[in-house]
Amino acid sequence: MAKGQSLQDPFLNALRRERVPVSIYLVNGIKLQGQVESFDQFVILLKNTVSQMVYKHAISTVVPSRPFNVSNHQATNAQAGYNAQHDDGDEK
């Protein structure tokens, strides 16, 4: 698994499993809404009245419409590792 996938896979999988409605904002400003039906390394399949294949490189932000659990030990460890690498010691 690539380092960049260690947070997004558990996040997207939890959205898919719990059928959480999401808003996906593209880099060009377009807002798409639906539920994550499936995903892979390059695309997210978003289902609303129709299914849309959205390329990840075109996505700016994924916003869940409600709280959900990302209960994945790997995601927690990845975030802790990221925080440790980016902690410069300056507390504000």
UniProtKB/Swiss-Prot annotation:
InterPro entries: Hfq (IPR005001), LSM_dom_sf (IPR010920), Sm (IPR047575). One of its GO terms (molecular function) is RNA binding. Belongs to the Hfq family. It comes from Shewanella pealeana (strain ATCC 700345 / ANG-SQ1). Homohexamer. Residues 9-68 form the Sm domain. This is RNA-binding protein Hfq. Residues 73-92 are annotated as: Disordered. CDD domains: Hfq.
